[in-house]
Amino acid sequence: MPYSQFRLEQIKSEFGITLSEQFGLFAEIPEATYSPFLSETLEYNIPLALAINSEKSRSEMIVAPILIELRKQFDNRIGLFSGKDFTVDSLRGLNGFCDFLISKSPEQLIIEAPIIALVEAKII
């Protein structure tokens, strides 16, 4: 089953995941600075992406520029992948294509563990 078909309740029961909802979890982390290029890009892209009103537009025009900026801020020490097959365990339904993957490895040819984030640009 592709990742997009999982529901939160199912993930909790099948994989023994515990949810922890905490207010202010990142409150102590200082605000990140970002480049003028990202600011200008988002200033133009966000209204356009919202007007187009699709997952693809939000993914390409909002999420991708932010993740590229993140990679730049880490001096390319993290891997960034888009639209890649990420089959972990097909028997347990852990397979499919992810909008974005971030890896702790700077390797760009192969997705290497650990994967530190999965990002999906979903319509809610």
Predicted features and spans:
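A short, conserved, highly charged catalytic patch centered on acidic carboxylates
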Residues: P2, I11, I17-S20, E31-I124
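Terminal, non-catalytic protein-protein interaction segments that mediate quaternary/complex assembly
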Residues: Q22-L25
